[in-house]
Amino acid sequence: MLPAVALGSAVKVAARRGAAAVACAALGGCSLLSSPAATSPASAPASVPAPAPSPGSAAATPSPPACPAGPAKFTCGMRARIAEVVAYLKHRPGVVGVVLRDRSTGAVWENRFAHIPVYMASTSKLAMAVALLTQNQAGVIHLSSGDMSVLHEMLHVSSDTDADTLWFKFGASFYTGFFPRIGLASAQYVSAPGITPPYWGEMICPATDLSRLITYVLDDMPASLRGYLVATLSHVATDQHFGVWGAGSANHPGNKDGWSVEKPGWIINSVGFAGPGQRYTLAMMNSLNGHGGYHAGTDTVTQVSAILFRGHQVQAPTISATP
């Protein structure tokens, strides 16, 4: 069967020949000449095949860049940014534990310091809020409207006074018995001058515990409680705009930060989420070990988040705080 184009050409040629035959008959007869379109293959000029290009003359087709080595189930782009974070942290003061989790794929990256215990500072307030909200809904305790206002301020401005109010009202054993259920499996309580443990302000844990805590918030809490905490952590006071907040507004971050001065020096922590639908969780704990202060620590944890979620560093936070 002829291709459609060839068949159409043949029909046109036949039509022209038919018309010519009719005209010749009307004139008393004439000879038909072959149309140029009907030239026989023998009379057509022979085609000369083009020489094959040499291997060196052919333009090389660029191959796509190889996906960097890294934790399974992360995108190639995220793997590259994780490598950038590793390189960045080599030149930062102190010890920084980092855990990144992709809730969509289940991918998890833990750096080499992720399992080292660090003072929690005010990140323990998030664990307190989770315990209070969960047990209130279960009917184990009752949170009054006043308690809820105190809880909100404890998260929004990281009020130590409000944390004390809720800690002593419900008792240390209420929290310590519940914390392992929400991810703080390795938490320890340490002594400090004038403080008898256990106390929310003198807790230590590794970044892996903080990662499990924020994962519990997003994956295991009832929808109403999860929604409350996501909204609250997404609208914290400006002095909480560091750490995970470095992901940038386009990534809709939310975080609970913490800072304190302990025996090892300044402690700067941040735990929270970023990405559409809180896709990623990020936990960071920075013990500066006497090699920097508040600004060095907040810059470090902010740049880690910025590199992971923006692909580049950002201006260092300009906020300040006192221990």
Labelled PLM ranges:
Residues 5-6, 29-58, 62-86, 90-92, ...:
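Structured C-terminal helix/loop/strand segments within mature extracytoplasmic catalytic/sensor domains
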Residues 95, 166-221:
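Mid-domain, small-residue-enriched loop/turn segments at the edges of structured enzyme/sensor domains
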Residues 101-103, 154-158, 166-170, 183, ...:
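Active-site-proximal beta-strand/loop segments in catalytic clefts of secreted hydrolases
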Residues 136-185:
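Conserved catalytic neighborhood of penicillin-recognizing serine enzymes
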Residues 200-261:
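A conserved catalytic-loop motif detector
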